[in-house]
Design a protein with these regions (language model features):
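Glycine-rich, basic loop-to-helix element that forms the pyrophosphate-binding segment
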Residues: 75-93
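The conserved acidic donor/metal-binding loop of glycosyltransferases
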Residues: 102-106
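N-proximal low-complexity "stem/linker" segments adjacent to membrane-targeting elements
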Residues: 1-38
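Short aromatic/hydrophobic "clamp" motif used to bind/position activated sugar donors
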Residues: 98
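Conserved donor NDP-sugar-binding/catalytic core segment of glycosyltransferases
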Residues: 109-133
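Short beta-strand segments
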Residues: 7, 42-46, 128-130
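Acidic donor-binding segment of Leloir-type glycosyltransferases
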Residues: 24-74
Length: 133
């Protein structure tokens, strides 16, 4: 199964993005251990006039995530806003499931297991995690 996780960023702090990525990476590891195979692609769409992630940082992130997550970084070159940014990232996806995630979200380690389990129910078409401060 293929999961595409996408986030629109605008002027975010790199350390906050990396913290969120590490939490996501842990959730993917837990999913692999408990459930099984899941191909995960994380896409950040950058609406900032000056890109948030330089080439070296992108390379470091890809290296950090490579065992569990394919990382893609798109610079829009304009302030796309959230909805258009997500539409641009979703245009050519081959994923079975898409997850929209705010860039500052720190996932609980079993979050993906719980969300994906609910999506297996035929009467469920969409799920959303509860956010707590």
């Amino acid at each position: 199964m293929k999961l595409q996780i996408q986030s629109v960023i605008y002027g975010n702090q790199v350390d906050a993005l990396v913290k969120a990525m590490k939490a996501l990476q842990q959730a993917v590891k837990v999913y692999h251990r408990r459930v099984g195979d899941l191909q995960v692609r994380l896409i950040y769409g950058d609406s900032t006039p000056t890109p948030v992630l330089d080439e070296k940082t992108q390379k470091d992130i890809r290296e950090m995530l490579k065992a569990e997550i394919e990382f893609e970084y798109k610079v829009f070159g304009f302030n796309s806003g959230t909805a258009k940014g997500h539409n641009l990232m979703a245009e050519n996806t081959d994923a079975d499931i898409m997850m929209i995630m705010n860039p500052d979200v720190i996932l609980e380690p079993t979050c993906l297991c719980k969300l994906m389990e609910l999506l297996k129910l035929k009467e469920v078409g969409m799920v959303e995690a509860r956010q707590t401060p």
